[in-house]
From Swiss-Prot:
Mg(2+) 1 binds at D34, D86, E158, E160. Keywords: DNA damage, DNA repair, DNA replication, Endonuclease, Exonuclease, Hydrolase, Magnesium, Metal-binding, Mitochondrion, Nuclease, Nucleus, Phosphoprotein. Residues 351-388 are annotated as: Disordered. Interacts with PCNA. Three molecules of FEN1 bind to one PCNA trimer with each molecule binding to one PCNA monomer. PCNA stimulates the nuclease activity without altering cleavage specificity. The keyword Transmembrane helix does not apply. This is Flap endonuclease 1. Structure-specific nuclease with 5'-flap endonuclease and 5'-3' exonuclease activities involved in DNA replication and repair. During DNA replication, cleaves the 5'-overhanging flap structure that is generated by displacement synthesis when DNA polymerase encounters the 5'-end of a downstream Okazaki fragment. It enters the flap from the 5'-end and then tracks to cleave the flap base, leaving a nick for ligation. Also involved in the long patch base excision repair (LP-BER) pathway, by cleaving within the apurinic/apyrimidinic (AP) site-terminated flap. Mg(2+) 2 binds at D179, D181, D233. GO terms for biological process: base-excision repair; DNA replication, removal of RNA primer. DNA binds at R47, R70, E158, G231, D233. Phosphorylated. Phosphorylation upon DNA damage induces relocalization to the nuclear plasma.
Length: 388
């Protein structure tokens, strides 16, 4: 789930923290990728006539097709990916996982109704909602990555937290995921849409953690409390408090404890036994493997091994697999090239550019404040409605 409404809040109040780029602009970068998020995307998106790709026995192969060709695309663009797989979820995530299970049950019932009615569009919609990444999917992806010569890391707990640890240790440049909580874990850079298909023509969105804090005018601890207030995977949020109200409260009171002492609890309903302190601990000190002990190596692909793994029962086209393997080898041989900016120290922004950017941010904030003033007579419930 990530953090509810965080990307929009940053876009509104800290626009300078976001930069859109083409994938080729990340040439020479090492990037830690949330593997489970990728596999889910591939199972959803890589389809033929609305259905997942599968073997004659019905075993899905969409995740392998997506992993193989999207990884080749990254390497073709000079990016060195390392995939990070989820470990055991923290106990505090049990509530969120239970909610997901309930939504799956609802989707299964809706799918049955759609199937009985013969509604193809609804059938496809609810089939997509029932997609989940299994341990078998992950194990197959790991085997594929080994054969491709691409490193992966098994996180002891949350993949986003392990990605953030790799970034903070300087092992990689950024975390690539669609979950915004990578920023809450302190990833210096977050990349969204990096593993999207080329056909979607989505520019990569790069979020800079330092600029997020600067634009929102928060410390790292205050930012974590903001994310908890907005809604995270580890605990419920206070009913009636949406993103804009959450940041107003954090800026006024600076932490959740002081907010709880000052808000009207008849208007804002605090969850019973609200475990926000434990959620905060999970963001501040997540369970991760020490990045200094992780050795990342990109090696030559095993062409024959790839053919054996992907062709045959999985029915991949052998010629295409061998062509893919040759592309992998070519990218491996060209990895000696480095980014030009690694030789130079970055110059500070010019005063004119900095001033113009600051004016833009102030205009956005002023516009948001004007809207708030016009709607201040509305009910707290309306202001606290969660974005979809």
């Amino acid at each position: 789930m990530g953090i509810l409404g965080l990307s929009k809040l940053i876009a509104d109040l800290a626009p300078l923290a976001i930069r859109e780029s083409e994938i080729k602009n990340f040439f020479g970068r090492k990037v830690a990728i949330d593997a489970s998020m990728c596999l889910y995307q591939f199972l959803i998106a890589v389809r033929s006539e609305g259905a997942q790709l599968a073997t004659v026995n019905g075993d899905p192969t969409s995740h392998l097709m997506g992993m193989f060709y999207r990884t080749i695309r990254l390497l073709d663009n000079g990016i060195k990916p390392v995939y990070v797989f989820d470990g055991k979820p923290p106990d505090l995530k049990a509530g969120e996982l239970a909610k997901r299970a309930e939504r799956r049950e609802e989707a299964e019932k809706a799918l049955k109704v759609a199937t009985d009615a013969g509604d193809e569009a609804e059938i496809e919609k609810f089939n997509r909602r029932l997609v989940r990444v299994t341990k078998e999917h992950s194990n197959e992806a790991k085997e594929l990555l080994k054969l491709m010569g691409v490193p992966y890391v098994d996180a002891p707990c949350e993949a986003e937290a392990q990605c953030a640890a790799l970034v903070k240790a300087g092992k990689v440049y950024a975390t690539a995921t669609e979950d915004m909580d990578a920023l809450t874990f302190g990833s210096c850079k977050l990349l969204r849409y990096l593993t999207y298909s080329e056909a979607r023509k989505m520019p990569v969105k790069e979020f800079s953690y330092d600029k997020v804090l600067q634009g929102l005018e928060l410390t790292s601890k205050e930012f974590i409390d903001l994310c908890i207030l907005m809604g995270c995977d580890y605990c419920d949020s206070i009913k009636g408090i949406g993103p804009k109200r959450a940041i107003e409260l954090i800026k006024t009171y600076r932490d959740i404890e002081t907010i709880l002492e000052n808000i009207d609890t008849s208007k804002y309903i605090v969850p019973e036994n609200w475990n926000y302190q434990r959620a905060r601990e999970l963001f501040v000190e997540p369970e991760v493997t020490d990045a200094s002990t992780i050795d990342l190596k990109w090696t030559a692909p095993d062409e024959d091994g790839l053919v054996q793994f992907l062709c045959g029962d999985r029915q991949f086209n052998e010629e295409r697999v061998r062509n893919g393997a040759r592309k992998l080898l070519k990218s491996k041989q060209s990895q000696t090239q480095v980014r030009l900016d690694s030789f130079f120290k970055a110059l500070p922004s010019s005063p004119n550019a900095t001033a113009a950017a600051k004016r833009k941010a102030e205009e956005i904030k002023k516009s948001a404040n004007n809207k708030k003033a016009k709607t201040s007579g509305g009910s707290g419930a309306a202001r606290g409605r969660r974005p979809k």
